[in-house]
A protein has these predicted regions:
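Anionic-ligand-binding alpha/beta catalytic cores of soluble enzymes and soluble regulatory domains
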Residues: 167-172
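Conserved beta-alpha junction segments in alpha/beta enzyme cores
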Residues: 1-143, 147-152, 157-162, 175, ...
């Protein structure tokens, strides 16, 4: 279960006891069980429909480095992960699906906007539809500290479409030089990791599922993860290690030590103690060594 968020969605989706009290009701609103129930039923319906309508498919994928779309939102000079993975799924029935992984907050629109929107993701979808894709699926990468803060010209729907079109341009380029996914099976792994909470002696166990498809390793992180934490691992193992964040749960932010030292928002909004992000990456690094 992979999610993302814009700054233009409904309130009421987080419970008040969310992560040991790290929950800002003024921002996220009171928990709305009716809204959440509707969302759960919709997701369940989608899962059942997809499972009951499975088809054979040809899957191809490619990578690209994105430019001029996003940067570190605290300091644009800090290096961040700009790798984009594009996956094209061509079903035997004729439908074509685009799945892409890229680390960036879809937050072009500002607080002045009061309309629900998928932000620049809609710009991608519009362009993909022109190329015959029936569905687009976004897997957000390590985006906790990445946004369009220093790259957007203005906070408008037009600008969201422009940046979305720019992301799609990089997707098209990635799919010009592709590899075919040959596997008929997938392999899944799962690793538990204990993380200490700040300002308390308590801790939580988080689960990190890993999906292997051929030589691709998808790591599912149940929080917004800072790019500064995951980038060294991607630099070490290459593009085949793919981080998908806000997956299966939402433990707010996992920030690096520098964010705590500078009191950046990612650290202030994180429920975890300083240094826990680095410990998580150390665990992941060791586990990847075992399974690759």
């Amino acid at each position: 279960m992979c999610a993302t968020h814009t700054h233009s969605g409904p309130t009421g989706t987080l419970q008040e006891d969310f992560v040991a009290g790290y929950h800002n009701v003024k921002v996220t609103g009171r928990y709305d069980p009716h809204l959440v129930g509707y969302m759960i039923r919709s997701i369940e319906s989608g899962i059942h429909h997809a499972y009951n309508h499975r088809e054979q498919a040809v899957i191809r994928y490619g990578f690209n480095q994105v430019t001029s779309v996003a940067s570190n939102r605290n300091d644009a000079s800090i290096e961040c992960d700009q790798t984009l993975l594009a996956i094209e799924i061509s079903l035997v029935g004729g439908s074509k699906i685009l799945v892409y992984n890229y680390g960036c907050h879809p937050t072009v629109l500002s607080a002045r906007n009061s309309l629900y929107t998928s932000d620049w993701l809609l710009g991608v979808k519009k362009q993909a539809s022109k190329d015959g894709y029936d569905m687009t699926v976004f897997l957000n990468g390590s985006s906790a500290d990445i946004s369009t803060r220093y790259t957007r010209i203005e906070s408008t729907f037009k600008e969201a479409d422009r940046l979305g079109a720019l992301v799609y341009q990089h997707i098209r380029e990635a799919l010009q030089y592709t590899e075919i996914l040959l596997t008929q099976e997938h392999v899944t792994y799962s690793k538990q990791h204990n993380m200490k909470l700040k300002d308390t002696h308590e801790s939580v166990d988080i689960s990190i599922p890993i999906l292997r498809l051929d030589d691709l390793y998808f790591l599912f992180i149940p929080a917004e993860l800072c790019s500064t934490l995951s980038l060294p691992i991607r630099n070490k193992y290459g593009q085949k290690v793919i981080f998908c964040t806000l997956s299966n749960n939402c433990y707010a932010y996992i920030a690096d030590q520098k964010a705590y030292e500078n009191q950046w928002y990612e650290a202030l909004a994180s429920p975890f103690a300083m240094g826990e992000g680095e410990k998580l990456m150390e665990m992941i690094d060791g586990y990847i060594k075992e399974i690759i």
